[in-house]
C-alpha cells in the first residue's frame, strides 16, 4: 500500500486534492464475481471479521477490482472513532457493537485492468462510478449515527481545503486531519510517497498503530 508523508502546515494548491483522514485500519479489498477478500497492510486475510462490509462490497459488478481504503467505526457526525474500533477488534464490545464501515479512497485494479499508472483523479472517478453502479453512494446517510449503504463509504475530496480544514478545527471535530494528494499522481505500492501528504489537526495525538 502507498503511504503518505507527514507535513504539519496546511497548504492550498489547485494541483492537489484533499481528503478527510479516517482513523482506523488500512485495508485492501479484492472483489470478483461476488466474492470479497479483505487484506491488511501485510496482506493478512481478515475477511471473516467484517461480514457486513463483505456483503456490501459483494454488490460490485464485474471484477476483479482492487480497492484501497480504511476500516472504521463512525460516530453520529460521520467522524472515525479509533478507540471504539480498537475496542471492537480486541473483543471488548458486546453484542450491540457499532457497525464497521469500509471507507474507500482509491482504486488499483478495475475489471481486471491495473490502473495504478493512471492519475489519481482518473482512479477516483472510476471508483466513484463502480460504487454508484452498486448503489453504495447516497447524498445523505439516513440514520443517526450515519450508517452508509451496506457499510461502504466513498471518500470524496473536499471542495475547498483551506476553508474546510479551518472550519473543522474551529468546530472541534475530533478528526486526525486531512490527506493532501497530488491530482496527477500514480499509485506506488509499498512506498511512502511525497505525492500524498498527511496534514494533522493541531493538538492531535497519534493513536495506536497496528502492524498486521
Language-model features: where?
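Catalytic cores of nucleic-acid ligases and guanylyltransferases
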Residues: 1-212
Amino acid at each position: 500500500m502507498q503511504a503518505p508523508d507527514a507535513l504539519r502546515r496546511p497548504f492550498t494548491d489547485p494541483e492537489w486534492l484533499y481528503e478527510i483522514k479516517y482513523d482506523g485500519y488500512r485495508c485492501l479489498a479484492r472483489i470478483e464475481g461476488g466474492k470479497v477478500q479483505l487484506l491488511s497492510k501485510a496482506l493478512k486475510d481478515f475477511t471473516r471479521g467484517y461480514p457486513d462490509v463483505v456483503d456490501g462490497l459483494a454488490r460490485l459488478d464485474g471484477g476483479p477490482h482492487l480497492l484501497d481504503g480504511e476500516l472504521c467505526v463512525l460516530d453520529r457526525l460521520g467522524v472515525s472513532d479509533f478507540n471504539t474500533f480498537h475496542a471492537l477488534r480486541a473483543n471488548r464490545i458486546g453484542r450491540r457493537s457499532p457497525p464497521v464501515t469500509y471507507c474507500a479512497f482509491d482504486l488499483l485494479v478495475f475489471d481486471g485492468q491495473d490502473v495504478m499508472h493512471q492519475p489519481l483523479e482518473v482512479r477516483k472517478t472510476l471508483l466513484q462510478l463502480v460504487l454508484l453502479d452498486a448503489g453504495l453512494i447516497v447524498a445523505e446517510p439516513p440514520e443517526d449515527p450515519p450508517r452508509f449503504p451496506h457499510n461502504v463509504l466513498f471518500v470524496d475530496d473536499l471542495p475547498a481545503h483551506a476553508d474546510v480544514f479551518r472550519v473543522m478545527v474551529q468546530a472541534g471535530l475530533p478528526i486526525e486531519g486531512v490527506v493532501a494528494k497530488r491530482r496527477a499522481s500514480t499509485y506506488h505500492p509499498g512506498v511512502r510517497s511525497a505525492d500524498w501528504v498527511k496534514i494533522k489537526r493541531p493538538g492531535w495525538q497519534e493513536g495506536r498503530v497496528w502492524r498486521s
